[in-house]
């Protein structure tokens, strides 16, 4: 039945059968002053008298104090820092922390993305894994209990493992971190998800103007051949295996590297601790 075939009576009948008595809305558009409107009376504003000319004793003390000009101090690497050879190809740079009981210990390897473009991928993948003895969550929980932290960074020319925390927990932290990094266990499912995320992020950066300007600057400075050499294609990223990436992490400890310590322990004491817990290759490459 078409709409045109319905008469007025049909529509009224349908409405009476199907529409409830209260199933409607009424809108009135009335002009004039609304006598039912309720307003809140404005409160009386009390002016605040200020004493702009008054000065407190503290202000007088600050204004009358004599401030000595700052004098620049420059680091003397021969006096402010000590050097010691821990093993062949491994040097310790030491500076004493006179302020508190916190330490910062870093291991710097001269291997970065310019030499091996997969290093940053290996770092990101390793950060998602557990070891033979600990899951990632268990490792994080133990680091938390020791009030310590670890961070691995990869730059163009260097890879750095940095740990920091309370000096009293240094030995336990070193043992935990080294045992964890040397015994990472691969997971193909995690690697698959990481590759997907990495490639998706790379694709999204193509639409970022700042990233494109930075890439253009790199191209102008170093040329296309260098950019190709230090940048993995999507196919090369897909071809990376878990074993290849974890081997890159493990081989770091076979390289010559620099150890930097800033903390309250003496040079002799920290040298013994590092030698005890930091396995170093007999013939580093």
Predicted features, each with a name:
Residues 1-5, 25-28, 98-127, 131-183, ...:
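M16 family metallopeptidases and their MPP-like homologs
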Residues 6-9, 73-78, 238-240:
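Extended non-catalytic domains of envelope/secretory-pathway proteins
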Residues 8-13, 17-24:
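Extended, domain-scale alpha-helical bundle/helix-rich regions
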Residues 24-142, 146, 162, 175, ...:
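His/Glu-rich zincin catalytic helix
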Residues 186-193, 284:
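Conserved short beta-strand edge segments in small beta-sheet-based binding/regulatory domains
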Residues 238-243, 248:
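A small/polar active-site loop signature that marks catalytic segments
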